[in-house]
Amino acid sequence: MTGTAHVDTFARDRLPPRDQWPELVFDLPELAYPERMNCATELLTGAIARGQGDRVAVRSTEGIAWTYRELEARANRIARVLVEDMGVVPGNRVLLRGPNSPMMAACWFGIMKAGAIAVATMPLLRAKELTDIATKSEASHALCDARLAEELDLARPACPALRRVMLFETDAPDGVEARLAAKPPTFADVRTFAVDTALIAFTSGTTGKPKGTMHSHRDVIAACDCWPKHTLKATPDDVFTGSPPLAFTFGLGGLLVFPMRIGATTLLVERPSPEALLDVVERHRPTVLFTAPTSYRAMALASGGRDLASLRKCVSAGEALPAATRRLWKDATGIDIIDGIGSTEMFHIFISHTDDDVRPGATGKAVPGYRACVLDDRGRPLPRGQVGRLAVKGPTGCKYLDDPRQANYVQGGWNLTGDAYLEDDDGWFVYQARTDDMIVSAGYNIAGPEVEATLMQHPAVADCGVVAAPDEERGMIVKAYVVLKPGQVAGDATTRTLQEHVKATIAPYKYPRSIVYVEALPRTETGKLQRFRLRQMAQEAR
């Protein structure tokens, strides 16, 4: 193992066992990186060195426009606040909480420059989920948008490692902005090793317990140098925008580090509903759009009379892209959506097609820099045309934070994404289904067991099971089968009560949009819930 610049070796000490590491592949010339690398230095200082310092790097819909030079100066000041005022040392985990905004982006880069580890969280998360993430990562510091401080305040008593929280987007005298004013615009970026952990991205697995995926500074840059360069083929004149949060690696890549690597501009939208995105395209004229299939469908249906002519590339990921949605968008804009599959574990898209080489029904081919195949349950390659487990290798790979589930995701050096695929005779990969119990609804990954546990906390519920149910608008929705306690009455009022209970306890997007009341749930003799039977019931109810 190489050296480390981390003083706090928490992440390094919690890497998976070496025999469970993915095999990394660096078979493109641009993937040859130096031993020491800080991704903020590469992305910001590098852009300025290439003569792009006066180009606009990041914009907001509220009129903020920072050049690369201004963004770096802001990130340098934030790094000074972290180190000089908050006591951050390289390797500390810094919880980052905020909507997509220029200040959120600057804070992320400030954390990178300080050699710390960013633990970004979605704005919708509640105190319980923030507690899980902060506890698992042992976050010692936090930067939080003042408008989102309430849930973090509720979480703090259960997070003993969280020593210092500082708020941004505030005029308070002890806030980040006030402290920035007293700092010079320079900072000596920590010379991290390329393999030092830069971020811990959290995702939920089938048990609902958060899994922290560790990505290095090299991972960030390698992701920038594969799919964006060889498949997206954007240019410095492009303006990126979209809906995925920067806390998702889909959003971190597509809306921050990819455009920075290219020398382009990113337009960050705090509340990117489909209607809001239509307004953004009309008013601000972005050229590259990232969002989920559900959003593309809603935008297409509401696009009548809208001027969307500035768009030239549209990217979809997060869930399967229905053929009907692809057609709707093509009819509305004349643009073929670039579909792809990625994962938090792999950082970003690893199978995709280009905008000029599309095969309806297929996700695409392995992105240059990556290899993919379909394996059987014993890890043996399957012939083309047979459905099996998708396996991937490349310059990035899964390294869970101190989690036994690493052995499930990485086997024989391959990353097993949890997706069932087949490879056709021409080498195109065709999606079949998820192989676990995750529910992918409108681009969000929702763990059924977590929703079950939340419903079971309500005094009216005796038993419940949660599965995905097909939905024309959202792809899939959360559907709950509920057994009520004696004396409780099934009906619309009870349904609304249970839905509001879930919304108030965990992130609102996880609530069951459909609730069916049953006498009993199908279980094995040992008491294990037979979710496959619930899925069958949900399919039959279409």
Outline where the language-model segments fall.
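Gly/Ser/Thr-rich phosphate-binding loop
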Residues: 261, 286-291, 300-359, 371
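Conserved AMP-binding/adenylate-forming
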Residues: 62-66, 81-128, 245, 445
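Structural core segment of the AMP-binding/adenylate-forming
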Residues: 1-10, 109, 113-179, 285, ...
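Conserved ATP/PPi-binding loop(s) of AMP-dependent carboxylate-activating enzymes
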Residues: 365-369, 380-412, 444-446
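AMP-binding/adenylate-forming catalytic core of the ANL superfamily
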Residues: 125-128, 142-145, 289, 392-394, ...
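Conserved AMP-binding/adenylation subdomain of ANL enzymes
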Residues: 221-239, 246-288, 302-303
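Conserved AMP-binding A3 loop
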Residues: 65-69, 198-222
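Conserved pre-ATP/AMP-binding loop-to-beta segment of ANL
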Residues: 54, 167, 183-202, 209, ...
